[in-house]
Curated annotation (Swiss-Prot):
Designated name of the protein: Uncharacterized protein MJ1062
Coiled-coil ranges (or none): none
Positions of the N-acetyltransferase domain: 334-484
SUPFAM superfamilies: Acyl-CoA N-acyltransferases (Nat), UDP-Glycosyltransferase/glycogen phosphorylase
A GO molecular-function annotation: acyltransferase activity, transferring groups other than amino-acyl groups
Domain of life of the native organism: Archaea
InterPro entries reported in the protein's UniProt record: Acyl_CoA_acyltransferase (IPR016181), Glyco_trans_28_C (IPR007235), GNAT_dom (IPR000182), PseG (IPR020023)
Record PROSITE patterns: GNAT
Transmembrane parts of this sequence: none
Lineage, opening ranks: Archaea, Methanobacteriati, Methanobacteriota, Methanomada group, Methanococci
Organism: Methanocaldococcus jannaschii (strain ATCC 43067 / DSM 2661 / JAL-1 / JCM 10045 / NBRC 100440) (Methanococcus jannaschii)
C-alpha cells in the first residue's frame, strides 16, 4: 500500500499539523504500509523534521504542483491535514486515489469528496462521536478520542500506571507552545514564584519565544530561581511531563497529552479564538477552587470524559482496510463498515436478545442503555464493524464483527449475526474472513477467538476458517487460534 500525506507548517504558524501527520505515519509504518511519501509547500525546517523521521518528502510550489506529483506516484491513499481544504482541490485529488482522508477540515463542501474525515478538535465541540454520511459515503470521526498521539505517550502512560501519585503539588511544568505570543510563561512563573510555597518548576520554551530577556530579569528577582529548569528543543515531551504533578498550558495538544497521561492541567487562553473553541467545555469540567492561579481552568484528568487517543485503531483500520466487501452470490454482497453512533440502538437490541447473549461469557440479561453506551465509549485497542447485506438494490444491517486486543500480537475476534433468520447463511464466516484479510494485510501473524463449549454454530464457523482449539479459556470456554 502506498500512502501520500499532504501537510504544511512552520515555526511561526505552528507545527501541529506536521507533528500529527508524523505521528500518524509512524503508526501506519508499523502496519505493513510499504511506502509513505510526504508533500509540503513548507520551508526547510519542516522538510528536515519529516526527513529526520525517515520519510521521503517532495517539496511543492502550490496545489497544482501537488496534483501533478500525486498523479505521477499513483498512491492508494491520500491523507490531507489542513484547516481549509478547497473544494476544487479535494475534487481533483479524489480522482487520483482509491481512498481520500482529511484531518482537521471543517469545510463541508470539500469533505463530501473524502472517504474519511477526522476532526478530533476542530468542529468537534470536544464531543466524541462517529457517523456515516450515507449520501456522500463519508465516515466522520469527531472528538479527542480520535487524536493520534505520539508513540512516546503510549509508552510513558504504561509506566505511569504502576506509580503512586504525589498527594500534593510539588513539580509543575509550564509549556505555552512555539511562540507564546501573550508571554503567559513569564506571567505564570511570576505568580508561582510570588507564593509562599516552594515548587520545582520546569519551563519549556518554544523556538519562537521572544521574551527571554524578560524571563532572565524575572529569575534574577527571585531567590527561588534555583528551583527552576529551562528547556528548549524537547525531543520527548512525554518523558518530561511524567515527573510533574501539574501542567500549566494553553488549550491544544499539550493539554490533551497531559490529560492522557493522567496529569491535571491549568488551562490559560492565548487569545479569543481559543476561548471560543474551548470555553463551554472547560467551564463544565473545571474545578476553580483547586486552581493555584488567579485565572484559567483547573482540569482534573481523572474526571474528564474525553477518552483521549482511545480511537487510534479505528483510524488505522479506516485508512488501511481495503477488504470491506465480498461478493457471495449473483446479486448479493457482504459489506463491513465501522459501527457509528447511528448503529448503537440496533446493536443494543441484538446484544439484548437472549438467543444471542446466552453465548456471551459475562452478560446474563438484557442491557440497559447506560451500560451499552458506557461500553461503547470506553473501548480501546479495538475496532467494531456493522455487517451489511446488499441484495439487489437494498442494503440492510444484519450483525456485527469486532477485533480487540490490537495492541498485542494475537488479537481477538468476535462475531454476532443479529438477524437470527439469517443464521446458517454463512454471513458470519464471510464477515470474519474480511477481518482476517485486513489483519494479515497490516502485518498480524495470528488471531484467536474465545468460544463457549456449547456454542456449536460459532465453533463450526471458526473451524471452517482454519481456527484450531488450542487451550482452555475461562470456565466452559475454549480458545481457538489461527495462523494468518
Amino acid at each position: 500500500m502506498k500512502i501520500a500525506i499532504i501537510t504544511d507548517g512552520s515555526v511561526e504558524m505552528g507545527m501541529g499539523h506536521v507533528y500529527r501527520t508524523l505521528s500518524l505515519a509512524n503508526e501506519l509504518r508499523k502496519f505493513n504500509v510499504n511506502e509513505i511519501i510526504f508533500f509540503t509547500k513548507s520551508d526547510e525546517d519542516v522538510i528536515k523534521k519529516i526527513e529526520e523521521n525517515g520519510f521521503k518528502v517532495i517539496k511543492c510550489s502550490d496545489n497544482n504542483d501537488i496534483l501533478k506529483n500525486i498523479k505521477n506516484i499513483k498512491p492508494d491513499v491520500v491523507i490531507i491535514d489542513d484547516l481549509g481544504i478547497e473544494e476544487d482541490f479535494a475534487k481533483n485529488i479524489r480522482e487520483l486515489c482509491k481512498k481520500l482522508i482529511f484531518f482537521d477540515n471543517p469545510n463541508p463542501s470539500s469533505n463530501k469528496y473524502a472517504d474519511i474525515v477526522v476532526n478530533a478538535i476542530v468542529g468537534s465541540e470536544l464531543k466524541n462521536r462517529k457517523y456515516f454520511d450515507e449520501e456522500n459515503k463519508t465516515l466522520y470521526f469527531y472528538g479527542p478520542k480520535y487524536l493520534i498521539l505520539r508513540n512516546e505517550f503510549y509508552k510513558v502512560k504504561k509506566e505511569m500506571l504502576s506509580r503512586s501519585k504525589n498527594k500534593e503539588t510539588k513539580n509543575i511544568l509550564i509549556a505555552f507552545g512555539g511562540s507564546d505570543p501573550s508571554n503567559l510563561t513569564c506571567k505564570v512563573l511570576e505568580e508561582l514564584l510570588s507564593k509562599d510555597r516552594d515548587f520545582n518548576i520546569n519551563v519549556v520554551l518554544g523556538p519562537k519565544f521572544q521574551y527571554e530577556d524578560e524571563l532572565n530579569n524575572l529569575l534574577k528577582r527571585y531567590s527561588k530561581s534555583d528551583k527552576i529548569k529551562i528547556y528548549k528543543n524537547i525531543d520527548n515531551m512525554a518523558e518530561l511531563m511524567k515527573d510533574n504533578d501539574l501542567i500549566i498550558t494553553s488549550p491544544g495538544m499539550t493539554m490533551f497529552e497531559a490529560l492522557f497521561l493522567g496529569i491535571p492541567v491549568v488551562v490559560l487562553y492565548q487569545n479569543e479564538l481559543q476561548r471560543e473553541c474551548y470555553d463551554d467545555y472547560l467551564k463544565k469540567i473545571s474545578k476553580t477552587h483547586l486552581n493555584p492561579l488567579k485565572e484559567g481552568y483547573f482540569i482534573d484528568a481523572e474526571h474528564t470524559d474525553l477518552h483521549i487517543g482511545k480511537g487510534k485503531f479505528e483510524i488505522i483500520e479506516a485508512i488501511t482496510n481495503i477488504y470491506n466487501c465480498k461478493k457471495i452470490g449473483e446479486d448479493s454482497k457482504i459489506i463491513i463498515r465501522q459501527i457509528t453512533d447511528n448503529d448503537l440502538e440496533l446493536l443494543m437490541a441484538w446484544r439484548s436478545n437472549p438467543l444471542i447473549y446466552k453465548f456471551f461469557y459475562i452478560q446474563k440479561e438484557p442491557l440497559k442503555w447506560e451500560e451499552h453506551y458506557s461500553w461503547w465509549m470506553s473501548r480501546e485497542n479495538r475496532v467494531d464493524w456493522i455487517i451489511l447485506l446488499r441484495e439487489n438494490n437494498t442494503i440492510r444491517k444484519v450483525g456485527s464483527v469486532n477485533v480487540s486486543q490490537l495492541n498485542t500480537d494475537n488479537p481477538e475476534i468476535g462475531i454476532l449475526i443479529g438477524e437470527f433468520f439469517l443464521w446458517g447463511k454463512h454471513i458470519g464466516r464471510h464477515s470474519v474472513s474480511l477481518v482476517l484479510k485486513w489483519l494479515k494485510n497490516i502485518g498480524y501473524k495470528k488471531a484467536h477467538a474465545r468460544i463457549l463449549e456449547n456454542n456449536i454454530r460459532s465453533i463450526k464457523l471458526f473451524e471452517s476458517l482454519g481456527f484450531k482449539k488450542t487451550k482452555k479459556g475461562r470456565e466452559n470456554e475454549w480458545i481457538y487460534e489461527v495462523n494468518l
